C-alpha cells in the first residue's frame, strides 16, 4: 500500500494542488487587475451599466454557491462510505456547474446581440477574457466532477479515494471564490 504523506504528515497530492491553486490565484489576480486598470476607459459603448444584468447574474452566483454546498455534501458522503449520497451530490454539483455555464453562454450571446464583442471596446475585451477564462475553469471542474461521478457509478470510487474527491472539491471551491470576486468587481462595483 503506497502512502502519499510527506515528512510533515501532509498528503503530497494535496500540497501540490495547493501550489497549483496558488498559481491560479496569480492568473486571476492579473486578469482582475487588468480589468480594473481599464475599467471606465472605453471610448465607445456599450458600457457596463448599459448591459450588465445584475439580477440574472445574482441567480447564477447563487447557483454556483449552492454547487459548493453540494460538493461539501458529496465529499462528506464519500468519506462516510455512503456512495448512494456521494454519487447523488457529485452529480448535483456538476449539474449546478452546467447551469452556471448555460447562464454564461446566454449572457455572452445576449451581450453580443447588444453589440458587445471581444474587440468592441476595452470593457468587452477585459470582460470576455476574464469571465471566459473563469468559464473555462468551470468547464474543467464540471468535466472532473462528471468523471468522478462515472467512476463512482462503476464502483471505482469510494472512501479510499476520498482524497481525490477532496482535491476536486478544493478546485471547485476555488472556482467559486474566484467567481465571487469577479461578480463583485465586475457587476456590483460600478
Residue ranges of predicted features:
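...captures the hydrophobic TM-helix bundle architecture rather than a specific catalytic motif
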Residues: 1-190
Amino acid at each position: 500500500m503506497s502512502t502519499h504523506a510527506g515528512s510533515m504528515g501532509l498528503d503530497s497530492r494535496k500540497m501540490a494542488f495547493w501550489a497549483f491553486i496558488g498559481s491560479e490565484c496569480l492568473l486571476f489576480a492579473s486578469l482582475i487587475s487588468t480589468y480594473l486598470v481599464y475599467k471606465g476607459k472605453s471610448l465607445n459603448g456599450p458600457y457596463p451599466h448599459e448591459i450588465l444584468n445584475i439580477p440574472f447574474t445574482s441567480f447564477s452566483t447563487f447557483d454556483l454557491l449552492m454547487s459548493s454546498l453540494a460538493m461539501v455534501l458529496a465529499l462528506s458522503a464519500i468519506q462516510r462510505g455512503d456512495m448512494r449520497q456521494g454519487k447523488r451530490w457529485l452529480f448535483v454539483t456538476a449539474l449546478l456547474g452546467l447551469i452556471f455555464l448555460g447562464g454564461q453562454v446566454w449572457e455572452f450571446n445576449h451581450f453580443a446581440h447588444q453589440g458587445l464583442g471581444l474587440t468592441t471596446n476595452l470593457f468587452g475585451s477585459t470582460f470576455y477574457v476574464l469571465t471566459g477564462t473563469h468559464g473555462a475553469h468551470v468547464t474543467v471542474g464540471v468535466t472532473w466532477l462528471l468523471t468522478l461521478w462515472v467512476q463512482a457509478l462503476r464502483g471505482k470510487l469510494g472512501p479510499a479515494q476520498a482524497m481525490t474527491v477532496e482535491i476536486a472539491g478544493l478546485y471547485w471551491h476555488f472556482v467559486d471564490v474566484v467567481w465571487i470576486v469577479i461578480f463583485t468587481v465586475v457587476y456590483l462595483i460600478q
